[in-house]
Amino acid sequence: MKKLFFALVIFSPFNLFSQDRITGEMFSTRSEVISQNGMVATSHPLASQIGIDILQNGGNAIDAAIAANAALGLMEPTGNGIGGDLFAIVWIEKEKKLYGLNASGRSPENLTLEYFKENNFKSIPAYGPLPVSVPGCVDGWFELHNKFGKISMADILSPTIKYAEDGFPVSELVSYYMKVAS
């Protein structure tokens, strides 16, 4: 019995490393995730679930992306939100066509290149009100939805509105930034 125990102790560690790894690496890696009917991946599980629910309820990938992005603006306001910009690249397989959207903020209507020249600016200042643009995110959602959306914007945004009204668990990351900011 003592010899058997010794043999198990000696050979067990080698057995851990002797398995073939598809990646070719000798350490654990993340598993591949595959799906037959669509997938949503975000940095927040509730936002991902909202996107999945949109797909399951008849929405398409654009609808799910808008819904997940709206949820991230609520649930992770440190990195997302309606006060930012939106950029999208959309491939429509049936058309074999690629679409792009630049929904970055525009300057206020009266803030023109001529204004900067007349006031002797050689470049746009880094600080103050002049470098601020009008957020383009929400307009981007509606541009994408008008071109590619399948279900109503009310249905797309209602899960996030419900979380905004009823509350949701705050993630560790957001909690940290709230603490630092207070």
Regions found by a protein language model. Name each.
Residues 19-49, 61-62, 66-182:
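Noncatalytic scaffold domains of N-terminal-nucleophile
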Residues 1-20:
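Bacterial Sec-dependent N-terminal signal peptides
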Residues 52-53:
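Surface-exposed charged/polar residues within alpha-helices that form helix-capping/stabilizing sites
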